[in-house]
Amino acid sequence: MTKKIDLAQIRVLLLGIWHFLLHLRQRLVEDQINIRAGHLAYVTLLSLVPMVAVTMSMLSAFPVFKGIRGQIEAFVYENFLPAAGDTVQVYINEFVGNASKGTAVGIAALVVVAIMLISAIDKSLNNIWRTKEKRSVVVAFSMYWMVITLGPVLVGASLVATSYVVSLKLFEGDALSGMMPLFIERLPLLFSVAAFLLLYMVVPNQKVKFWHALLGAVVAALLFELGKKGFAFYVTKFPSYEAIYGALATIPILFVWVYLSWMIVLLGAEITAAMPEYLDYESSSNAGETQPLAE
């Protein structure tokens, strides 16, 4: 009897997952996330240098971050730009150095371009959530400005806090010292989960449940880590792009990786947005009021 009950529960669970995946596939087709990801990748490449310039300027305003700027850069490029991170870092730092020498008008233009990226992300995610009510211009600008100003500070503060925790004598014992390499190794994954969770909860102009956002964030973070390893493996083992593009090989590598990254971000958003729809369908279906979400 127990085995039959267990098998029945497993069957119901698998059937529920299957129906959810069908609904998710239908959503992905309707929202054309491949086209959205391409648009966001294009805007990201245009905004990359301005965004980095504004970020570094914000960090430079706080003396506590000046000594660890190199560590922050190394962490970001190593963990978010696989394989070609060193080359990209050299070029971006050179571009940022040139941009920082500009006039007040030029710096204002950099901020505007950086806001364009955040605005594009905002519109894409709210379209995924089918948000009908738009934010007012004042609220939207305030949110974008908060992301630009507070985002870099929070990232820098988290890295400083992590470095401080790792350096504590509390972790120098034999039992705990073996855990630190594992903790540091998992740090990029934890940062990714936190970043995706914040993105999926704050950006949509409607209430998003924590557990729904956490599910989407965990899936996106895991795919992001797998994507980094897979992309780095391809770039190092099959370097045909270098023979084709030569010195410009970094450009297509960066574009492809940014495109794949946005595909992952949007997929996590679709999962988060699809969860309440599917759960509402399940509750209504049990009451005999609705038809299946997807065939």
Curated annotation (Swiss-Prot):
Protein species of origin: Shewanella oneidensis (strain ATCC 700550 / JCM 31522 / CIP 106686 / LMG 19005 / NCIMB 14063 / MR-1)
Keyword terms, alphabetized: Cell inner membrane, Cell membrane, Membrane, Transmembrane, Transmembrane helix
Keyword check for Membrane: yes
Designated name of the protein: UPF0761 membrane protein SO_4401
GO CC, one annotated term: plasma membrane
Domain of life, per lineage: Bacteria
Location of this chain's protein in the cell: Cell inner membrane
Lipid bilayer topology: Multi-pass membrane protein
Classification lineage: Bacteria, Pseudomonadati, Pseudomonadota, Gammaproteobacteria, Alteromonadales
InterPro entries: UPF0761_bac, Virul_fac_BrkB
TM stretches of this protein: 4-24, 45-65, 102-122, 137-157, 183-203, 213-233, 247-267
Stated family: Belongs to the UPF0761 family.
